[in-house]
């Protein structure tokens, strides 16, 4: 599954119903504007807070091993929500270790978070593969 995020309840209920059948969900954390976190505050796309708050919501329905974060690989790959690979890595740190968070802090640490994906490999290539090179290297050193 690669759902866009604006209708949390619909997608997450489907994911919950499918349960262990799902291998991985890479939710699209871009092209969505601002959205609320579990704490009731709104977070703007294109920030570490948005990524961690929305992933934290998904992680209330699925196991960390089923969840990846999906982001555009370059500024041209999406209408909004692009972040540099360093922000993606900070979100991964926040979600897995509770460090490098912004103002939003997840309700738990998820060390077995599945990973990240970019939209798309073609956009990443046009941007010097900066997403895949940086995020892949960072995922490799995260504690499991």
Task: Please name every model-derived segment.
Residues 1-144:
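Secreted glycan hydrolases and related glycan-binding modules that recognize and/or cleave
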């Amino acid at each position: 599954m690669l759902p866009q995020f604006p209708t949390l309840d619909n997608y997450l209920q489907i994911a919950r119903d499918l349960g262990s059948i799902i291998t991985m969900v890479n939710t699209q954390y871009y092209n969505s504007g601002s959205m609320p976190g579990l704490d009731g505050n709104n977070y703007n796309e294109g920030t570490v807070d948005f990524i961690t708050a929305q992933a934290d919501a998904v992680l209330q329905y699925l196991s960390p091993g089923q969840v990846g974060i999906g982001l555009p690989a370059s500024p041209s790959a999406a209408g909004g929500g692009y972040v540099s690979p360093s922000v993606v890595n900070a979100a991964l740190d926040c979600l897995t270790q509770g460090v490098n968070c912004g103002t939003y802090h997840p309700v738990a640490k998820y060390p077995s978070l599945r990973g990240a994906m970019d939209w798309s490999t073609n956009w990443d290539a046009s941007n010097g593969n900066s997403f895949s090179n940086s995020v892949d290297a960072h995922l490799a050193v995260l504690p499991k």
